[in-house]
Amino acid sequence: MKKTISIIISIAMCAMLASCGGVKNEVSDTEQPTLIDTMSLEEKVGQILFVRCVDDEQTDDLMSIKPGGILMFGRDFEGLTKDEVKEKIQSYQDKSDIPLIIGADEEGGTVVRVSSNPNLAPEKFKSPQEIYNEGGMDAVVENATEKSELLLSLGVNMNLAPVADVSTNPSDYMYDRSLGQNAEVTADFVSKTVTAMNNAGIMSVLKHFPGYGGVGGDSHQGTVYDDKTAESIRENDLLPFKAGIEAGASCVLVAHNTVNALDSENPASLSPTIHNMLRLSLIHISEPTRP
């Protein structure tokens, strides 16, 4: 290839395309087995990759591996108008034989890849925690719908949200991005947010499995350990993920923290034990690794 392609996330993309209502599926269920049967090994591998296109000159090289989806960061939206974003995303779709998943992180608060651009939104979306504190769960649902509609209007069909971590301690690394409430309230938030996103027609991603509450460090910067007991994880951290899955969440994103009670040898993103907790319920994404 002319340029090095940055592979950001591994994702079970074939399963996602078959199961997620957020993508307009132009290949019928009866045609999919035939399509897969005609794919080369290289093409099948490409379909399980969720990648980032660093610049427009890279698009042809990137599409040659037939990726399942493209993840867009803040710098991919920066300074662009709505029409320019739509044109960029459509150019990706036009070069793909299979409809692409186009993903972005628009949680609200500190993670606003799209609404940070004033050309795309009048102001940055507030965090779910702030919205909840101001107007309760009804306001959170309305906000989730507004975010979904904005992303879909641009051609983004997956929002890497909601944050399902249970955090009530302001010193936790994930506190500001969480709802800041207990497990039961967080589970209700996740369930209603996923339902709102499904109703809008956008894919949701629960994160960061099996929970990032009660952890003080950033696993992007170094090794982070979670010392909670397995019982505490089952009774608290897993509740929002279970609620989100039952509500019809599209995916689960796995964190990089090492959860000692479940697998003390591997970070969650590389843990067969933790992956196997999900495989019978839902496909999952590995937390992005920094290039």
Residue ranges of each PLM-predicted region?
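Positively charged n-region of N-terminal signal peptides that target proteins for export
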Residues: M1-I9
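C-terminal motif of bacterial Sec signal peptides marking the signal peptidase cleavage site
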Residues: A18-S19
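N-terminal hydrophobic targeting/anchoring segments and the immediately downstream early-domain regions
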Residues: N25-I102, E106-S116, I283
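Second-shell residues forming the walls of enzyme active-site clefts
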Residues: S40, E78-S91, L100, T110-V112, ...
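Short acidic, glycine-rich surface-loop motifs adjacent to enzyme active sites
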Residues: I48, M63-G79, L160, T168-N169, ...
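Active-site mouth loops of central-metabolism enzymes
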Residues: I48-D56, P128-V140, G222-E235
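Short, acidic/polar
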Residues: C53-M63, V140-K147, L238-L239
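A substrate-binding/cap region within the structured catalytic cores of diverse enzymes
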Residues: K126-V194, N198
